[in-house]
């Protein structure tokens, strides 16, 4: 025993001396060469050892990427105080330090060996470790260093900010152990824990692994055994009594560039207990290293290529502090990019999932709580390893670049909302719409126009229907848009027509609403815009009591259900029975027709009202029947029987016109050809094609040189809104408009042309603008070559007497027939009796054109007289017909139908005569025109923004160019619309402004195109009787400019009978035939070209094929 004791004391003395020498060194005995030699180490070696500690592999004797094993050795030593301490030493080669990790795949900014690792961590302070009676073990509870990216490091150098201000440091009270603790017990515990886990891991990764991490130690002396027993007792007490101080204090930061090799690190805010999850929810850390290896999904960071099998710490957001226990208990894995890419198995083995090895590699003893946490983590890691599929490392996921972006704290920014295209909000931006929160309390519907009394305006914003109000925003010419708010409590009736072609709602309100609207919209009779809600005008009260909203399209079932439910709720709220009613298409169409006629009939003089009183019931019904046919918005047959067809099938190109090598060819497809079916709207391709066809095929060379036709897209592009551009901020709105189309006229000077044609499309409706004589600065009068003064005076007196006598005889002979009386009365009340020009009476009989015209008029009058009275004599009817025909021609301004000595005949007269003689249907149409025509209807509803309107009381000589010695050519803009509706003054204004800028660009000087210089007018032109032929009428307007040219441009202008309406019934088929014929011709040309240049077949065979193709 004595010898044993002496031997033990001698060993203790030797051990204490070696420990004293070790403590005297700068690194406190922790160096790269673990031995008890007396060699000194440099400060640089100490720095490198600190770096090596961070990359120590946890498996004992595990192979590195270079095939070398790590030597690990455990010893029990005693300090000068007589305490026995367990130390574990691991030697790591310097070549495996972080020097080789520069430019690693995860984008981390690793430091070289000449820099301390603490300079690149988030906190420069390291844990002070465990102190055993004055002996400080530096790496007992070392915080896992979180390495920052290069971007964060550069930011820290600029801002000196590493933590958010609310993150505070948690100080740790070191654990002090009493002397003579049971070291052997700690060894035994550690060996048992590793022997339970490592065999399972060895089976999983199928690699040879040692059952124990520690090498066998020599037998301990009895004194050492006694110390181990004491340590075991202390360990049980520590599990219950030892607690760590979690008091927080201000965060102490040191400069990231001040630490030197011998400088001691300070405490960090992460303890052993917090790291292993005992107090996870209270850990005030802002960066958590999460290495959940359950799925082995390897993500790229900072755009670097990831190595398969490399473990990347996940830097989470500040909101993710409260992490579950399982996340923090995941194994912590550190690896470098010098691992072999092809040796995945060795890499898996070298990166141990056991945190126990990492703990045991520290020279400080483990407490009971730490040991329990290690065992728990080891078991969980083993279960996760079992669930990993064998090929999981091959299945890598690559995130987009934007998803990999990080903010200044290393947090992901993929939650940043993406910039989306601007869409119209379903709720209005003002406070009124905020009251409509429920989808069944409000609905937003697209409406095309509104009519209040005789006021007609287009809408620029969708209409909002709510339980409390209806919000309408309409366009006001030359002013800012007007917003109307109708309180639903003031409504008394709502009638709804929801058919596909005419979705319209009729609202009725109390008189105060109409008065408010009259003031807000500035409605007055001087401007011929008013509403008569109080019944002052008995004839128009019914039509003017509505507030009419015409929708853009028919409502789908869900929208219709919401709309009707809102209207019903309004009726219940107002306590009005039968508040909401549905009306059929016929009634809705009739009301719209009546509203259109209301304006025209209202502006008539008292003469027109007296004339209405004289009309009989039969004649009145005939007028109403024709009015319905003329002004009906839609054909009833089309609504009830014919539906729009939808083009189905592949789109094939039919023709290119003009064909190559000509420039500016327009491609026409079979889908475009489908637009020529009855009831379909013409598209821009057909419009542009036919206008170009007219110029190139039908017009004479001199006529084509006098005109310029813009594309149907010109006005849309001119008036198109664009995003703000810094280059155009200083330009006016007129210059911005012109800039969009400035290249359209780079090869043409439009001011050298006589006519500029601009097809326009607004609200799915085609109409035509004609800029006449843009180069003239003032009206120009020229002698009328067809004017003969003597013939006019002589013929006027002769025809006037004959008209009076014949009319008187007709009065006597037809006095017994009440149905004919209105017609005769109407003729006697005319202001003028128009003369028929004829210098040579003998030429009347010899001229076949005169005979042909008289025959057609006789045919038309026969039908009139037959309708008026079957007993009327034929000669009297002939006299009446001559008078009516003469008057009709004079009032309508048909220059070509005057029978002058110059024998002037143009295209319109030929067309009219042909249609009159070909069918009885054309005669019936002429009959309707003759009966219903009245001088008071001249130039009705002509409107313009400059006030140059048609006069109601204009004489019948207006438009009679052949009765005046001069003809007028003046700059003007004519708007030809086949559906007489709103004033297009804004269109005229925009075209004027374009001409001003274009003149300045082309001529280099400024010129005014104001309303005094360039007048605007809406001439009365033939009107369509359906809702789909507007494009066809636009094409005919252009064609009639050359078939029946306008010689005098005095305003106002009446072109109501410019061309016969029956022609429009065959216009679509005419255009279709032109396209098909061009297709056939171009197909033959292609075949001819192919056969001519074919070298595969012999010459004779090729010629035969060409002949056959021509015959086909």
UniProtKB/Swiss-Prot annotation:
One of its GO terms (cellular component) is cytoplasm. Pathway: Protein modification; protein sumoylation. InterPro entries: Papain-like_cys_pep_sf, Peptidase_C48_C, Sentrin-specific_protease. Residues 352-366 have a biased composition (Low complexity). It is found in: Nucleus. Residues 666-1112 are annotated as: Protease. Its main location: nucleus. It comes from the Eukaryota. Residues 891-902 have a biased composition (Polar residues). Its EC number is 3.4.22.-. Interacts with RXRA. Forms a complex with KAT5-TIP60 and UBE2I in response to UV irradiation. Interacts with RPA1 to maintain it in hyposumoylated state during S phase preventing DNA repair initiation. This is Sentrin-specific protease 6.
